[in-house]
Regions:
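Catalytic pocket-lining loop regions of alpha/beta-barrel enzymes
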Residues: 118-231
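Active-site environment of divalent metal-dependent phosphoester hydrolases
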Residues: 10-12, 55-58, 83-86, 111-114, ...
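Short, electropositive alpha-helical surface patch
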Residues: 58-74, 158-164, 214-223, 245-256
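Active-site gating/metal-coordination segments in enzymes
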Residues: 60-145, 152, 196-200, 208
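Mid-to-C-terminal alpha-helical segments outside catalytic/metal-binding sites
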Residues: 1-3, 26-47, 220, 224-231, ...
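Conserved, mostly hydrophobic/aromatic
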Residues: 6, 48, 63, 76, ...
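Divalent metal-dependent hydrolysis catalytic cores, especially in the metallo-beta-lactamase
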Residues: 22-29, 34-55, 73-81, 104-111, ...
Length: 295
């Protein structure tokens, strides 16, 4: 069984995606659940976690609504304004709203904030406490420069489950960095942090990456987090800039010990996000997904 813990769905006609320029311009098109389903079917992926892209609660509401039409969407990592004095009310509205039971986490693009210590701000700390109180996870979208602050925040919120996206975005194309390795080690020392094995192909040379070139980063994450705190994520459709869905999945599989794959490819996602996978498996998610609407 496989769970994809990180992918996106979007429609540029419905919101702003200012980063879809230059090399990322090919992504400026609609990507629907219907587009993803053939990939899931071809590769035996039974369930997924769809992750926000826009800093807009409306996108989170739209993603939650999609889960009612596509049962393979086991969870939504959405967005709320962590700096708002009303963040607890925003979370409550989402959790008690339409399909709110599928909200499993919150994410904010910390890497886009000018201040590398943004996570340490008092208002953000209050917001993270509200996320913990709501029983949700928090996805860390950070680069190596923010890893030290992320480790401090994880230590300050031991009851909050943190999930590091894309291994903290190591500069694979440049051959890695000591800053990334130090930061990853510090964050991994916190037992309430999981790490997604995702996004590596787009941190590498898009045209020349190889499994062997990614292997040291997978090995570093495995050494730091161990088999119980690693999750597979495709980062579809962003990954398609450099690789197919199947290539991404295969690269991660080949870079890990076979005895750990069961945990990394579904059990850990269930633990980190508290996914209700039993119901999904019983329903036959992939078959149900093929019968859903193409949106």
């Amino acid at each position: 069984m496989t769970v994809d813990s990180h992918h996106h769905l979007w429609d540029p006609a419905q919101g702003e995606y200012p980063w879809m320029t230059g090399r990322f311009a090919p992504l400026r098109r609609e990507y629907t659940a219907g587009d993803l389903i053939p990939e899931l079917t071809a590769h035996g992926v039974r369930a997924t976690v769809v992750v926000q892209v826009r800093a807009d609660v409306r996108e989170t509401e739209e993603l939650l609504a999609l889960t009612t039409r596509h049962p393979f969407l086991a969870g939504v990592v959405g967005w709320v304004d962590l700096t708002s004095a009303r963040v607890d009310r925003q979370l409550e509205a989402l959790r008690t709203g339409y399909a709110g039971q599928r909200l499993v986490g919150v994410r904010h693009d910390v890497s886009s904030e000018p201040d590398p210590g943004w996570l340490l701000r008092a208002d953000v700390q209050r917001g993270l406490a509200a996320v913990a109180e709501a029983g949700l996870a928090f996805d860390l979208e950070v680069t190596p420069r923010e890893l030290a602050a992320a480790a401090q925040v994880a230590a300050a919120h031991p009851d909050l489950r943190f999930v590091l996206d894309h291994l903290g975005k190591p500069p694979v194309a440049a051959g890695g960095s000591a800053l990334w390795r130090r930061g990853l080690a510090g964050l991994a020392a916190r037992g309430n942090v999981w790490c997604k094995l995702s996004g590596l192909v787009t941190e590498a040379d898009w045209a020349r990456w190889t499994d062997a070139g990614l292997a040291p980063y997978l090995a570093e994450a495995a050494a730091r987090f161990g088999p119980d705190r690693l999750l597979f994520g495709s980062d579809w459709p962003v990954c398609t800039l450099a690789a197919s869905y199947g290539q991404v999945l295969a690269a991660v599989r080949r870079g890990l010990p076979p005895q750990d794959l069961d945990k990394i490819f579904w059990r850990n996602a269930s633990a980190a996000y508290r996914l209700d996978l039993g119901a999904l498996v019983a329903a036959g998610t992939t078959r149900s997904a093929r019968g859903g609407s193409d949106d």
